[in-house]
Every structure is written in C-alpha cells, then in structure tokens.
C-alpha cells in the first residue's frame, strides 16, 4: 500500500484490523524484519491493525533531497500517522534506529499513545557515546560456517551471537535483501553525519513521563547499540518493563524469538488493559 503525503509517497503494509500499531524498522533495512519479528505474536490475538511502513530511502519508499536529517524523517512519520489513522489513539513500536524515531513520536504525541515497544533500541545517535560490549559468538556452528564462502560467513556472523541456519536465513531475507534495494546514498547522507543522524532536540527529555505501558527489550551481547544506555531512559516510562536477554545481540528477533514473543504478548495484555479493550482469543 502507498500513502501519498505532500512531498513523498510512503510504502507500507497493513495487517489485521482494530487498534492501530505503527511499527518503525531499523536503519538500512525495511519493514520486513519487523514483520518477521512480531507477526507470530498476532497468530492468536485479534483486534490489532499492524501498520509497517518503509522509512524514506528504505524499502519501497524513496529518499528525497529535502529530507536531510532525523528531524525531517520524524516529520514524515508524524505526517504518515496523521494521514493513515487521523485522530485515532495508537500504539507505536520501533527496533534499533526505529526505536529512536518511536521515541520522537512519543515526544510529540504522548497524549495519543496507548503503548510503546522498543526492541534493541538505539539510544544515542552518536557512536562514540554508546556503551557496547565487544562482539562474541556464544553458539558456534563450525560446519555451517565451513559451507559458506569466507566473505559471506564474515558478513553474516560479524554481529550475530548465534550461528545457525535460521539466523542465516533471517539475515539474508530481512537484512541483506533490504540493504540491496535501499537508497544507500540517501542513507549515508544522514547516517554518516552525527549532526544529521541525531535529533536537534533531546528526545528523552520528555515534558512529562509517558504513562502508557512500555516494553524495552535489549540484547545482552548487542555489539551495535548495547543495552546499558537503554536503562537510562526507563524513568520516562513508569509503566515500563525493561528486559536484557542473554544469548542475543542485535538480531534478538531470531536469536531469542520465543522469549521476545512472550514478552510482547504480555505487553499487549497490559496495553489492552490500559486502553480498556480486550482482543485475546
């Protein structure tokens, strides 16, 4: 599906019906990894309209010259929300850099939000300010690695904590294929300059704490964004659950899929209670 905004057409996928959840993917990928991570949760849960968009310069949404920084990316997301679910209360979720944008949505629309999900969240856009553990492989599969070309194996497993065929398929399907179709020139214009990649405002200096049920899930071995920084924002979310999962890095969605699904399901229970609805079957 496409949403025609003033100066850009945003591609998105909408699944299910009911209370809307806006899902924001990570940097240099597209909405497919969010679908892979979260759709299994909704197999036995009705009443939720999941809206997965491709951010500008990612997936099937083009980059535009006028989008030069994170603030303008957020403007597109807010405009998209206003057009697709005008005047409605909603839930927002984001992974990695999408979690940074999701907090931007909270900053501007907290009064309309019934829930917040942050997985492997990017907290600071400045690489030098992140607290990250070194990469480690906890579950090695030497036979699998030997089947791959050395360059491919290095590319696949340089950040993975678990070496398995499931992880290989996940990265190939949800990350490498998305890298190929994204506008890398557009992405680099923002990502390679910290002043462009960061918001111009402190996204975590909320005027008031966000009262909606929140789930923050980080990987204990995440060598991309770490886990320690996410703890620092917890006081913004008095209804927040904070979880750090062992045996998982930035690919937490596949490395600890069952635990993630259980946590998201429990978070949705809390959101439904908070919003005064029940959709469990």
Regions found by a protein language model. Give the residues of each.
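Catalytic histidine-centered segment of alpha/beta-hydrolase-like enzymes
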Residues: 248-261
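Flexible "cap/lid" loop of the alpha/beta hydrolase fold
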Residues: 103, 107, 115-147
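Short beta-strand/loop motif that positions the catalytic acidic residue
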Residues: 210, 216-218
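Conserved alpha/beta-hydrolase catalytic His-Asp/Glu region
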Residues: 127-128, 132, 147-208
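Conserved HGGG/HGGXW glycine-rich cap/lid loop of the alpha/beta-hydrolase fold
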Residues: 8-62
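Active-site loop/oxyanion-hole signature of alpha/beta-hydrolase fold enzymes
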Residues: 49-93, 262
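Acidic catalytic loop of the alpha/beta-hydrolase fold
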Residues: 221-225
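Gly/Ala-rich beta-loop-alpha elbow adjacent to hydrolase catalytic centers
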Residues: 94, 98, 102
